Amino acid sequence: MSRPTVAVVDLKSLRSNFALAQSLAPGANAIPMVKANAYGHGMIEVSRALAESAPAFGVASIDEALTLRQAGIQQPILLLEGTFSCDEVAIAADNNFMLMVENLVQNDAIVNASISQPIIVWLGIDTGMHRLGFQPKEAIQAYQALKNSDNVAKPIIAASHFACADDMGSSATSAQLAIFDQWIKSQTLASGDIIKQSLANSAAILAWPKTHRDWQRPGYMLYGNSPFSEEQDNADKLIPVMSLQSAVISIRCISSGESVGYTANWTAKRDSTIATITVGYGDGYPRHAPNGTPVLINGVRCPLVGRVSMDMITVDVTDLDLVSIGDKVVLWGPELPVNEIAHHCGTIGYELLTRMPSRVPRIYIN
């Protein structure tokens, strides 16, 4: 019998979340972001599940894109960070990869490449995140060079990324949008070109309808998790796709004053019943999860107690009416959002999902 720690991935919920993204911006193309192994959910399986409805897919690197091609995914694939070397441009052309262009080195590599067919190019414009992309003035020169190149398919897509779209109280998104729109307006007037546009990440899809342009880029929301720290009407419709599950493997009674686990960082204040669960930081469960982090056992919330080990955690089940070895445990999932666990741990759900190691089997349902 295999170890009972598994990540159950509900593909029906995945498709529902993607349909929500499409419905919120019906005039736009929605590109599922499947980078980082589809946020830990399994890039190939997720892409196959969405292949009938997705016009393209988004990844971080050419290695991820080639993995999808080798798995039989036929849609265009967007490389969000573009190419890292000149030889990747020819590989991109041969495989119908779309390239984000973030700097003049990447721009020149495309313009000067010897390739089999023109490439669809996304011109990254830095409107305020200050991480990647051309400054607006530099983007004019880059756009003109791309426009004049036979290596570039037309129209070119202008793109930017929001820094604070998940903060509804921030003025940063409106400021970035204004900079982007001014660039589009001036470039359209100067060139007469039709410039396709992409702005909306998950938070913008859910809450900033003015950002819904030709292409949108659902990521975190695709996997059923809200990018917001507070409630948001559209985000509340999302269904978590992954359920990290395990089982009770030991039950023991300890006396008041006895401690549990490495460093003895939790001491019972009463006679207690402790259940040991076969999951730990070797399975992606956060080592820094503090005492009191909720764990579901037989559908009931119970507090984590003691240090998280590589392969095990311990949970106080004193208040459970009945618990037995083999009982089902949920670490996060639809009944216990990964965002809640992340909040207890001082991190974000994105990190917990993407750090899920390969030793945890993914089980795909629906």
Task: Pin down the residues of each PLM region.
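Active-site anion/phosphate-binding pocket segments in diverse small-molecule metabolic enzymes
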Residues: 2-11, 15-18, 64, 83-86, ...
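Active-site-proximal beta-alpha core segment in soluble small-molecule metabolic enzymes
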Residues: 6-9, 13-16, 26-198
